[in-house]
Amino acid sequence: MEMAKEQELILVLDFGSQYNQLITRRIREMGVYSELHDHEISIEEIKRMNPKGIILSGGPNSVYEEGSFTIDPEIYNLGIPVLGICYGMQLTTKLLGGKVERANEREYGKATINAKSDELFFGLPSEQTVWMSHSDKVIEIPEGFEVIADSPSTNYAAIEDKKRRIYGVQFHPEVRHTEYGNDLLRNFVRRVCNCTGEWTMENFIEIEIEKIRQQVGNRKVLCAMSGGVDSSVVAVLLHKAIGEQLTCIFVDHGLLRKGEGDMVMEQFGEGFDMNIIRVNAQERFMSKLKGVSDPERKRKIIGNEFVYVFDDEAAKLTDVDFLAQGTLYTDVIESGTKTAQTIKSHHNVGGLPEDMEFELIEPINTLFKDEVRALGIELGIPEHLVWRQPFPGPGLGIRVLGEITEDKLEIVRESDAILREVIREEGLERDIWQYFTVLPGIQSVGVMGDYRTYDHTVGIRAVTSIDGMTSDFARIDWEVLQKISSRIVNEVDHVNRVVYDITSKPPSTIEWE
C-alpha cells in the first residue's frame, strides 16, 4: 500500500489481540492515519514508512511461550516513540533487560490504577478505571525506565523511558471499559509523537485521486458495480479522478431489492453521468437456480454465474487495463497478518476469473466501513444511499430459504420494502445495524375475513452491532413491530403470519442462509 509522504502515520504492530483493529480505529478517529502490520515487519520497511510513532499491540500469548511473537529490538533504537500495550509492554520489558514472569492467574476485567501526571497521563485524574487482560506480569523494569502508574495488583501498571520516549501500559486503553483510554492514546499521538491530526476524508480524496491518475495515466478502468456502498464509492471516486476512462458493469441478476436496479442506473448513471452497462441477466440466473434448495449450492451458482456474465461483458470491451474493486481495510487485515483470526467468509459474490489480465485498483483498501461511508458523503453521494443496508452478494437468493421462485422473491421483495419504509419513518435507520425480511419456507393456518388460509410466514431479522462480527437482536418497540406486521399481512399476497427473530450472534448468524 503506497502512502503519501506528507501523511502522518502511527504504525500498529500486530501480536494477535482481539482489539487490534480498535487501536487503529481510535487513532484514525483523532485525525491521524494509522495502519496495522504484522509484528515481523522489517526495520527497513519501518524506515521506509517513516511513522511518527509505533504501538505494540496486546496478544493472548506469554512472552515465555515457545515460538512467542517478538520484534527486532532495533525498533527501540530508531528514535521513534513506542507504546507497548499489555503483551507489548511485557515484550518491551523483556527485550530491554527487565524481568517478566507468569502470573499465578490471568488478570481479566476492570481495575483501578493510580497514575502520575506525565506526558502519557497529562491532564488526567490520578485514579482511573482501566481494563486489564494479561497472563504475564512485570516484576522488574529495564534500566532507564520509571513507574508512572500502579494498581493494587501490580507495581508496574504503566512505565516510561522519557529519554527514549518508550512507554508501556499493562491495560487496554483502546477499549471503552478503560475510563480515559482515548485521552491516553491522544496524549501519545499528539504530545509524544507530535502528530497534528490533519487526516480527513477531504485530503484522503485529494491524495487518492492523484494516486489513481498516476497509476492509470490515459488508460481505461473497469469496475464491477453492485449498487452497494463499497462499489458505489469506488466508482464515484474513480469517476472523479479519470472521468470517461471508467466503465462500470452492473449485473442485474434478478435477486435485488425492490427498485434497486433502476435506482443504480438513475442515481449513478444519470446523477453522476457515469458510463454504466446494465446487464439484465434475471432469466439466466433463475434457470440455473431452478430446483436448487441447498444454500451452499445456491451461493456457488450465483457467484459463478456472476463471474461468467461479467466475463462475457468485459470481453466486449477493448483496451481496458485495470479492474477496480471495493476491498476494505478489514479484508486486508484479515488476509495480511499471520496472527489474524479466520473469520467466516462473507456473502459477497466470488472473485473474478484469474485469467482476466487486469491490473487491480483498490482505492478504499485502507479504509474501514464507517470511513467509506464518510468518504461517500464527502464525494457527494446522497446520504440515503451511503447509509443503505448491507446486502449480500447472492442477494435475495439467500433470503428465500430453499428453492427460489419468482413468487417467493416477490414476497420477500415486497415485505422487505415495507420493513425498510417503516424503519425509516420511525427514524430508526441509524439505530439498527441491519434489518431485512426472510421467507423461511413455512406455511401455516390463518383466518382472513371469513376464510381459512394456509399461507407463508415472513421472518423479520433486525440486529444491533458495532462491526457485524457479533450482534444482538434489536429491541424494536412493540407498536412499531405491530405496524410492520400489520402492513405485511395486509399488503403482501400469500402471507398470513409474521415472526421476529430474537437470536443473537453467536450462536446464530445475521443472515439465515
Curated annotation (Swiss-Prot):
Signal peptide positions on this chain: none
EC number, as in UniProt: 6.3.5.2
GO terms of molecular function: ATP binding; GMP synthase activity
CDD domains: GATase1_GMP_Synthase, GMP_synthase_C
Broad class of enzyme this protein falls into: ligase
Domain Glutamine amidotransferase type-1: 9-198
Segments forming domain GMPS ATP-PPase: 199-388
Family matches, as Pfam families: GATase, GMP_synt_C, tRNA_Me_trans
Reaction equation(s) it catalyzes: XMP + L-glutamine + ATP + H2O = GMP + L-glutamate + AMP + diphosphate + 2 H(+)
Keyword tags: ATP-binding, Glutamine amidotransferase, GMP biosynthesis, Ligase, Nucleotide-binding, Purine biosynthesis
Annotated binding of ATP, by residue: 226-232
Domain of life of the source: Bacteria
PANTHER family noted in UniProt: GMP SYNTHASE [GLUTAMINE-HYDROLYZING], GMP SYNTHASE-RELATED
Quaternary assembly: Homodimer.
NCBIfam families xref list: guaA_Cterm, guaA_Nterm, PRK00074.1
Name of the protein described by the UniProt record: GMP synthase [glutamine-hydrolyzing]
